[in-house]
Amino acid sequence: SGTTGFPKGVVLTHHNLLNNALAAAKAMKFTRWDKLAVPIPFYHCFGMVVSNLMCFSVGATVVIPGEYFRPEEVLFAIESEKCTAVHGVPTMFVAELEHKDFHNFDLNSLRTGIMAGAPCPPVLLERVMNEMHDREILIGYGQTESSPLAHLTKKDDTFDRRVNSIGTNVPHTEVKIVDPGLGVTMPFGEVGEICFRGYHVMKGYYNNEEATRQAIDENGWLHSGDLGTMDSD
């Protein structure tokens, strides 16, 4: 919402947000002993829910590198605070890896994190895992309308699965692939629109009933507007 059209306010509930944050924490095996570097803006659902609220839900530490994103501040925060995780969009990880002083920072404390917001090229994931020592980093997919996480890879997933898929839907939710024109469910491997249903679906668009009806059908399915395929597993 807002990327390709006029921005719409998304109404999310406490139930939406807290459960989505807990889903992220469980996927990352996060505990009160972990520390997360958060360079993502707090006004974005990724930073607000999947980062801050996720830490609050398990008592983990939120480390704020700076007022806005500077790669050197993120690297310094990870080293100085011994962060066990870092979140970001792919371009943030690229900026960190390409920083002229990257190899002067000790990032061995890193264990996990989430990369989301755009597709992750295989070479980038490989560098994050090997050069940043972030071996358990997860790939996430979603949108503000789904609180925001809808899909997430697992820490034990193979490299191929992490770069060639968006993982499985988060627990206690449903997903299906439908023909955008006919609305029928597509077979495994066939391209269609990704639809979600579950606790994470927004209450609706703020003061916009027409847009809400277009996004959420009578059976509670949120139509993402994105195309994808579903594997048998």
Label each PLM-derived region with a short phrase:
Residues A60, S80-G88, L97-R161, E174, ...:
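Gly/Ser/Thr-rich phosphate-binding loop
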Residues R32-W33, L110, E218-N219:
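Phosphate-coordination loops involved in phosphoryl transfer and adenosine-cofactor binding
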Residues L18-K35, C45-A85, H99:
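Conserved AMP-binding/adenylation subdomain of ANL enzymes
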